[in-house]
Amino acid sequence: QDLGLAMKLIREFPDLPIHGSTQMTVHNLNGALELQDLGFKRVVLARELSINEIDYICKNTKIEIECFAHGALCISYSGQCLFSSMLGGRSRKSWKMRTAL
């Protein structure tokens, strides 16, 4: 995600809820707190987190948390589809990314 654009939207439209997706690779409390401090309303956590890690983040932040309960897991870093597309020649926009099911 474009953090610069997100910050501009937060400044210009303070009532617009901004969500951080898996492409922001938020996989720990520090990442969730950083987005919270920047003004994001919700974060979608990285897919590979355990239920215990998700619980810890939920209990220690005020930002809304969203997570995947089931689905394909990226072979590369979750949400970093460009790297996967460079390795395998598959486009993230065509939904033909390399995943582990």
Go through each PLM region and give its residues:
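Active-site pocket-lining/capping segments in soluble small-molecule metabolic enzymes
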Residues: 1-26, 44-48, 53-101
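Short, acidic/polar
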Residues: 26-33
